[in-house]
């Protein structure tokens, strides 16, 4: 399924308790994440998504896609793939819409059940990350400070989520699913707290599209 990474979409307040025991670099990473989830209410930017294959040193890029995103906490966002195909995941705070342009098909599902312990809960949800995740200190790689998030629920799609910051900016996420597959998301051109129009997340079903409700 092409939108597997964020579907079924489809936050780290308690992590502050780790600061005293964590190394300085990790304290900085925790501070940056805490700042992101509490102070960034809206944002827009670009992303590149890489599906990886193999393990460890043998990890190689299997496929690459890219696009744009915009969000307004909590639960309003538009995640748009533009290459190599067009696809849209959009939520208005209540309902998540997944639109496949090639199939001219829209899937609707209730947003509350779609976020949960997914990467979307970090990017687009409330700032109560400790409700859904446990936190483990990660390494600093190429100047990017990492934290590892493990979903508290055992039946989630992802078994581990890494999130990296540099200079207060969200740089990347590494997602490992229950089957051992790894996906890397890198972010660029991020604008923090832009003013967004009132109808920015209103979804209109494309003409002639089939609609499936889940």
Curated annotation (Swiss-Prot):
Entry's Gene Ontology BP terms: lipoprotein localization to outer membrane; lipoprotein transport
This chain's function reads:
Participates in the translocation of lipoproteins from the inner membrane to the outer membrane. Only forms a complex with a lipoprotein if the residue after the N-terminal Cys is not an aspartate (The Asp acts as a targeting signal to indicate that the lipoprotein should stay in the inner membrane).
Question: Where in the cell does this protein reside?
Answer: Periplasm
* Subunit and partners: Monomer.
Superkingdom per UniProt: Bacteria
Q: Where is the signal peptide?
A: 1-27
Q: Which NCBIfam families match?
A: lolA (TIGR00547), PRK00031.1-3 (NF000661)
Q: Which organism is it from?
A: Cupriavidus metallidurans (strain ATCC 43123 / DSM 2839 / NBRC 102507 / CH34)
Q: Name one Pfam family in it.
A: LolA
Q: Which GO terms describe its cellular component?
A: periplasmic space
Q: Enumerate the UniProt keywords alphabetically.
A: Chaperone, Periplasm, Protein transport, Signal, Transport
Its family remark reads: Belongs to the LolA family.
Q: What is this protein called?
A: Outer-membrane lipoprotein carrier protein
Query: Does the record's keyword annotation contain tRNA processing?
Result: no
């Amino acid at each position: 399924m092409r939108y597997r990474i964020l579907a079924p979409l489809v936050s780290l307040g308690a992590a502050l308790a780790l600061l005293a025991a964590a190394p300085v670099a990790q304290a900085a990473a925790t501070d940056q994440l805490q700042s992101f989830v509490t102070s960034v209410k809206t944002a827009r930017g670009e992303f590149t998504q890489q599906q990886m294959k193999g393990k460890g040193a043998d990890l190689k890029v299997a496929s690459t896609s890219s696009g744009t995103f915009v969000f307004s906490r909590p639960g309003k966002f538009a995640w748009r793939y533009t290459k190599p195909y067009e696809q849209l995941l959009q939520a208005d705070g209540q309902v998540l819409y997944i639109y496949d342009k090639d199939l001219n098909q829209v899937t609707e599902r209730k947003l509350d059940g779609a976020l949960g312990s997914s990467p979307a809960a970090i990017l687009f949800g409330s700032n109560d990350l400790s409700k859904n995740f446990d936190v483990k200190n990660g390494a600093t790689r190429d100047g990017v400070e990492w934290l590892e998030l493990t979903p508290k629920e055992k039946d989630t799609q992802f078994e581990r989520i890494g999130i990296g910051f540099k200079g207060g900016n969200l740089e990347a996420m590494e997602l490992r699913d229950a089957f051992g597959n790894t996906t890397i998301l890198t972010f660029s051109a991020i604008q923090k707290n832009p003013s967004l129009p009132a109808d920015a997340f209103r979804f209109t079903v494309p003409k002639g599209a089939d609609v499936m409700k889940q």
